[in-house]
Amino acid sequence: MTTRLRARRARALFLWRSLLPGGVERTAITLVDHLQASGWSFFLGLLEPHGDFRAWTRHPRRLLSPRWGPRTERQEENLGFALRAIPRLGWYAVRAQALLNRVKPNLLFTHSGVDVLVAGALARRRGAVWIARVGSDAFSDISEKHPWGRPVFKRFLSAAYRRPDHIVAASEGLRRRLTEDLGVSSARVSVIPNPVDVARIQEEARRPPAEYATGDFVLGVGRLTSNKGFDLLIRAAARLFRNERPIRLIILGDGEEREPLRALARELGIEHLVTLPGYEPSPWRLMSRAVALVAPSRQEGFSNVIVEAMACGAPVVATDCHGPREIVNTGVNGTVVPVGDEEALARGLEELLREPERRARYREAALRRAQEFAVARVSDRYMSLFRDLATP
């Protein structure tokens, strides 16, 4: 039976691995900062002592970071990542227990990952309500890369997702994955999108752009991993080049695919059109000036980048993944194309490039759509869920 929260003076601990740059991490900081005004005490506890996003918080005293411990470099959460995390579970258990002892939370909110299993088990012993956030389709991602392990991984995830008292899915597609494929009761799953600090992003977007962001360009933003599909974007740009519609391409982010992407651009003869400057702490100043933002992911549970680009007025071309298809309305505020189809991606981008009226229409609609994910609106939905778990 779900443990009930006390409606007054409730204490909530958000437990995250680290604050390395990423959508999951920005979601945590944005929520914890905004929810401070709710009357509850919210804390963000980290299992690892690093992350550039620590500077993003407006409430540093509510950020609980260890001074030492293991450091995991940002990478895709695949089967190899999960296996490599096993030796760190002892540290995670010690760290999680220390945070629980310090905060004494009534509610524990975590993202999904191996650390969650440890933290959730500890929270059970303290009597805290455990809510897990699922923001990516780990089942599809790992099953496609390791089909031989699909049955075992399905059983593992099914068992893991039964343990939280409640689950928040970042999109309707993720909710269906949990309930239809992994056997999670629909009564235990809510759909709440990621929050976006629209006002703060629009303020940042007015800052001068980086020196390399001059002229017309198409923008990609994200971790440079296979899952993000930036190789498809480069191939699409090469098609446009061959069709005598060259466009400059800027891809922001770091990751193991950075050099392979450079090599691909050289191989396709468009190295002079592709810029890979690395991690950019303020991508919004480029989003506001881009001809279009392209999100070519192979898997995407939500997509903070798409909503942030919309908040900056950037027209969007995205692939038909769980999150993007629920954010982008083709022909209204952007274009959605099939996953993995570089020809369709090139075609969708070319249509935007040759139709300035369409770009202008998308910009206006995108600005309106972004407001639906504004942090005030989304955090109200989270607080409603938290209060539903509280004793009247």
Regions found by a protein language model. Give the residues of each.
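Short hydrophobic beta-strand element within catalytic cores of glycosyltransferases
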Residues: 315-318
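Conserved acidic donor-binding segment of nucleotide-sugar-dependent glycosyltransferases
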Residues: 330-331, 335-342, 351-356, 371
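N-terminal strand-loop element at the rim of the active site
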Residues: 14-22, 28-30, 34-83, 188
